[in-house]
Amino acid sequence: MIQILTGTALLLAVLALFTLFSYKAPHGMKAMGALANAACASFLVEAFHASLFGTQMGITFLQGVGDASGSLGGVAAGILVPLALGVSPAYAVLVGLTVSGYGILPGFIAGYLVSFVVKFLEKKVPAGLDLIVIILVAAPITRGIAMVMDPVVKSTLLQIGTVLIQAQETSPIIMGLILGGLITVVATAPLSSMALTSIIGLTGVPMGIGALAVFGSAFMNYVFFEKMKLGTKKDSIAVAIEPLTQADLISANPIPVYVTNFIGGGLSGIIVAMMGITVSTPGLATQIAGFAVSVAENGMRGFIAAVACAVVSIIAGYIGYFIFKNYKITTADEIRGTQEEVAA
């Protein structure tokens, strides 16, 4: 139990760190938005093509498409974050390519930090020499940062994963509550539930919990975003399909979103654990692919569990609204300057 509490506290600390970064770090919100775009460009493609069309339907070509995209999350983050911070496209690609082979979070951290180095060099080095200097200085620094951060990120994810494994050894209700709650929270955070469940090799009932809890969260987040008026209808649909598309908005409202997701995910997890739904493929903690594989491997029992998870998740969305309806929120307009852009 102590280990479970320790791991849970670690997860909360990581989530708090991302929120602090969004608010206090220079261009934090822009960087988080770029991270969300990188996750969509890599993990979402991987979820559909590799996990669904490749693994489940046996389409080898699409398996390759998904695997290729999923393996380049770090490169995507390393390119998109500098672009968001105002680095010229050529230098942004240069930075991103140097983190090839590393995950999305090491790529994000390296891309963010080196963006300031590149902008400084662009300003101070005479035109014509800046390309050579940036190649000689920024490229090795970028890879060095990614190399240092990679074991830190992996050890953090593995520690969180240990919580999920430890919970499996307790009662089904506790296992479902903790796994469902934590994986659903991770699904809304920049950690990526797909990456987490892949790294720790989650299979069986724990993976079934992750798959259907995240599936249910699509309905819950849509209801919650709509009722709280966090963004437009488009934002609500986007967060239902892939929460990472709204990473900046979620990081700006961490307590309402994470608490609501833990409630819905925990309820879904209990249902899945009690029904014994299993998934044999790790990394399927994603809305559409998780649902499809759960039903494919468990038949009508999996479908019934999915419907039940959707129902309790919708209820959780309303519960979250009633809890936080008077809570001061930060809207998409405030974060992204939508109203100002329209007025201009």
Briefly describe each language-model feature range.
Residues I2-V342:
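Pore-lining transmembrane helices
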